Swiss-Prot record:
<keyword id="KW-0689">Ribosomal protein</keyword>
<dbReference type="InterPro" id="IPR014726">
    <property type="entry name" value="Ribosomal_uL2_dom3"/>
</dbReference>
<dbReference type="InterPro" id="IPR008991">
    <property type="entry name" value="Translation_prot_SH3-like_sf"/>
</dbReference>
<dbReference type="Pfam" id="PF03947">
    <property type="entry name" value="Ribosomal_L2_C"/>
</dbReference>
<comment type="similarity">
    <text>Belongs to the universal ribosomal protein uL2 family.</text>
</comment>
<comment type="subunit">
    <text>Part of the 50S ribosomal subunit.</text>
</comment>
<dbReference type="Pfam" id="PF00181">
    <property type="entry name" value="Ribosomal_L2"/>
</dbReference>
<feature type="region of interest" description="Disordered">
    <location>
        <begin position="1"/>
        <end position="22"/>
    </location>
</feature>
<dbReference type="GO" id="GO:0019843">
    <property type="term" value="F:rRNA binding"/>
</dbReference>
<dbReference type="InterPro" id="IPR012340">
    <property type="entry name" value="NA-bd_OB-fold"/>
</dbReference>
<keyword id="KW-0150">Chloroplast</keyword>
<dbReference type="InterPro" id="IPR002171">
    <property type="entry name" value="Ribosomal_uL2"/>
</dbReference>
<keyword id="KW-0687">Ribonucleoprotein</keyword>
<protein>
    <recommendedName>
        <fullName>Large ribosomal subunit protein uL2cy</fullName>
    </recommendedName>
</protein>
<feature type="region of interest" description="Disordered">
    <location>
        <begin position="224"/>
        <end position="273"/>
    </location>
</feature>
<dbReference type="GO" id="GO:0009507">
    <property type="term" value="C:chloroplast"/>
</dbReference>
<dbReference type="InterPro" id="IPR022671">
    <property type="entry name" value="Ribosomal_uL2_CS"/>
</dbReference>
Length: 273
């Protein structure tokens, strides 16, 4: 990823660092409009996810997470920006005339060939079942349910590792540090998701953040008591509690948010860090 640093001409561009290499030119038959409503509200209009709203209009790119074009080689034609995710996407032209978008694997360039199937080479961008991969393979876009499509390790720079295979299950180390079991028949894509340097980007100004649909974050200690448990007091005052809390009074730091007694608890060998 090519990082472009702005010249110091105005305060808004003084600290900006953006990607100037990849552009967006989507195909009409692979995009469709989507209606954003709610902006972090539930059905009653109450805020359940803060700091969301506004943002530029987006067209959704239909991504092929299933990779079900079996044993048909495809060629990478373009590498494009996708406003709906921080990873890039590739337009693939398959030998049978099919055209689809996939996540951009790290290191893939225009003109490379990829293929999905059961007996395909272990090379970057190829998709195949976990049972056909050697131990230690770096993978992304991993299925949890057979045939449903990849659901794990899809963000920019994400990569998981196949560390064991036993019986009907394979053991994976996920990007979060979690170690869990997945059926060996589920498929995944070899390699790491591209755009690894996404964390090096600096928007430089608040307006660029608003384009992404992210609104300002306000500290609870400067709110009124009716709005936040930390609010109230005269002037600059402490939160008045032993530990920080959420706006709804739950512990804010270190509290586990995973739902208890989920069906997949038995598949997780080590929880995430």
């Amino acid at each position: 990823m090519a990082i472009h640093l702005y010249k110091t001409s105005t305060p808004s561009t003084r600290n900006g660092a953006v990607d100037s290499q990849v552009k967006s030119n989507p195909r009409n038959n692979l995009i469709y409009g989507q209606h954003h409503c709610g902006k972090g509200r539930n059905a009653r209009g109450i805020i359940t996810a803060g700091h969301r709203g506004g943002g530029h209009k987006r067209l959704y790119r239909k991504i092929d997470f299933r990779r079900n074009e079996k044993d048909i080689s495809g060629r990478i034609v373009t590498i494009e920006y996708d406003p709906n995710r921080n990873a890039y996407i590739c337009l693939i032209h398959y030998g049978d005339g099919e055209k689809r978008y996939i996540l951009h694997p790290r290191g893939a360039i225009i003109g490379d060939t990829i293929v999905s199937g059961t007996e395909v080479p272990i090379s970057m961008g190829n998709a195949l079942p976990l049972t056909d991969m050697p131990l230690g393979t770096a993978i992304h876009n991993i299925e949890i349910t057979l045939g449903k499509g990849g659901q794990l390790a899809r963000a920019a720079g994400a990569v998981a590792k196949l560390i064991a295979k036993e019986g009907k299950s394979a053991t994976l180390r996920l990007p979060s540090g979690e170690v869990r079991l997945i059926s060996k028949n589920c498929s995944a894509t070899v390699g790491q998701v591209g755009n690894v340097g996404v964390n090096q980007k600096s928007l430089g100004r608040a307006g660029s953040k608003c384009w992404l649909g992210k609104r300002p974050v306000v500290r609870g200690v400067v709110m009124n008591p009716v709005d936040h448990p930390h609010g109230g007091g005269e002037g600059r005052s402490p939160i008045g509690r032993k530990k920080p809390t959420t706006p709804w009074g739950y512990p804010a730091l270190g509290r586990r948010s995973r739902k208890r007694n989920k069906y997949s608890d038995s598949l997780i060998l080590r929880r995430r860090k």
